[in-house]
Amino acid sequence: ITAISGNTTEAGGTATFGISLDTAPLTTTTVAIDLSSSNELEGTINGSVANNLTLTFDEFNWSTTQIVTLTGVDDLLEDSDQPYTIITSVTTTADPDYIGLNPLNVSVTNLDDDSFGILVTAISGNTSEAGTTATFDVRLKSAPGINVTIDISSSTEAEGIISGSVAN
């Protein structure tokens, strides 16, 4: 297994590593290595929705490195950088040199792109004594772990009052 090229990101950034065999398997024999992600909510393998991959080697391609691409998944949570593992399974083969061989797992981190905070859009329109309104939107930068309440008030109620609605 070659060294991983870096980390994945919640913005869809990828990391890669490669796998090849040290020796050729017996003629007409294949060696299969199954890969899966320990946390498909943080990273996927080769963009697979099924989140698993089987690499197959034979007497012709055993020394050719097969590249595995990992893609970060955005969870919309401010949960810091999250480590996950690409789990390799025991090889499937009839070749005695590879029976029961379990390649090393690959550790990777999905870099978080979410942050805590509140976003307020620029005000649209102006209020007037004739009753015209102005609007602005308030939203969270990322999904909260618990309910969040934001109090909004007017500094001078004689000049304007606050009313609004909640949208999800």
Please provide the spans of the model-predicted regions.
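Short boundary segments that mark the start of a structured unit
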Residues: I1-N168
